[in-house]
Amino acid sequence: MQFPILSVIVFTPIAATMLILLFPSERKDETRVTALAAAFIAMFLSAWVYFSYDKAAGGYQFVEKYNWLPQLGISYHVGVDGLSAPLVLLTGVVMFTGVLISWGLDDRPREFFAFLFILATGVFGVFVALDLFGLLFFYEIAVFPMFLLIAIWGWKVTREYAAMKLTLYLFIGSVISLVGVLAMYFQSGLGTFDMLALENANFSVEFQRIVFPFVFLGFAVLGGIFPFHNWSPDGHVAAPTAVSMFHAGVLMKLGAFAALRVGIMLLPEGARFHLPWLIILTLVNVVYGAFIASVQTDFKYVIGFSSVSHMGLVIMGFATLTKEGLIGAGVQMFSHGIMTALFFAVVGMVYDQAHTREIPKLGGFIRVMPMVGIAFIVGGLVSMGMPGFSGFIAEFPIFMGLWRYQPWIALVAAVSIVVTASYIIRVISRVFFGSLPEEFVGHVHDVTMLDKVALGVLCFILIGVGVYPAIMVPLVETGVFNVLRLFGGA
C-alpha cells in the first residue's frame, strides 16, 4: 500500500489548525512557529509529488480511493495529473511564503493562521479531487474562510463591503455550478460522482449544450471571468497581504481549474458548442483588464485588474482547445499564481512602511528597500511576457493557440501585452525610482530577512521556469493529453 501523500498534503493544514487553536492566545511565537512548520511540510510534500510524477506514464498518479457515502456513489477519490500537480505545488509555495510574510502580524495570529490553513485545505482538496462531490465539498471549504479573513483582518475602509461582495458572487457561482453537477449526476444514470466514470458517460449533445454554461460559468466566476469579475479587485484591495497572495495566486486558479476539470472535460461537446462566446468573454477580460489597470492610481488596484487580464488569458487558452493553448494555460496558472503572490507581497511591504498605496505619493523606494524593488521588477518582466521568465513560457503558447483558432483574436489580445508593459513600467518608475518623498525619509526602512526569503523563493521560481521550461512544460503536456483525447485529439 502506497503512502497516502496527497491526503497528508490536504490535511496537514487542518491538523496544524487544530494544534494552533490549542495554544493560549498570548503564545504568539508558538503559533507562528507551528504555522511555519506546517506550511513548510505542505510545500515540501507538494514539491515531492511534483518532481516524483512519472511523465512517461502520464494519467492520474498517487491515487487514493475510499468509500465515503457508497449509497449515493460518493467516495474520497484523489489523484494528480500533469495539470493539477503544478497547482498543488503552487498552493504549497504560496502558503509557505504567505506565512513568512505574515510573521509580524500581531492581531490575533492564532485565529488568522487557523482560517488561512482551512482555506489551504480546501484549495489542496479541489486540485486533487477526482470525485465531484468531494470537489464541491473542498470548494466550499476554500471559499468560506475568505469572508472572515477579509472582514476581520482586511483594510478597514472597505473590508466589510469587499467581503460581502466576494461571498455573494462566489455563493451564486457555487449554486449555479451545483445545479449543473446534480444534472450530470442524475442524467448519467451511473449513480456515482466519480469524475473518471463520468468522463465516459453518454451524455447527449443537447444535454451537454444546455448544462455546460451552468457548470463552466459557475466555477469561472471564481476565475474572474467577465462580466462576473468585479468582486475580484475589491477583494484583493481589502484583503491582508497573505490573503491577497492566496486570493490572486491560488483561489482564482481554483475557479479556472474547476471550470476545465468539470465543464470542459466532462461536457466536451458542450464546450465545443459554446467556444465562440467564451473566447469573446475572455478577450474582454484580457484587453479590458489591462486598460483598467493602466489608469489606476492605487498600487493594489493595478495588480488586481492585472490579475483579471491575465486570468482571461488562462481561460482563453482553455477555450482554444488546441494543444498549444492548453499547455500555455496550464503553465500560466502556475506562473501567474507565483507572480501575483510576489506582486501582492511587494504591495503589502510598501504599504506597511508608507501607509499609503497611492502611486503619485510614492517614489524612490528601491533606495531603502532594494530587494523589494528588484522583486517587483522581476514580477513585472514576468507580467510583460519577457523571454527568460515564466510569463513568456506561458503566454507564447497561448497566443500560438489563439492564432490557430482565429488570427484576429490573437492580434486583438496582443494589445494587452503593450498595455501591460506601459502600466508595469509606470509603476516601477513612480514607486521605486526617483527621489524618496521627504515625509518618508528616516521613517521607511528595509524589510525583514523573512520577507526577503519569501521574495527570493518566489523570484527564483519565476526565473527558474523561464530559464529551464523543461522543468514544467513536459509535465503540463501530459495533462493536456488527457483533455485532448476527450475531443478526439482536437
Language-model features: locations:
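Alpha-helical transmembrane segments and their helix-start/interface "positive-inside/aromatic belt" motifs
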Residues: 29-40, 161-171, 369-373, 449-457
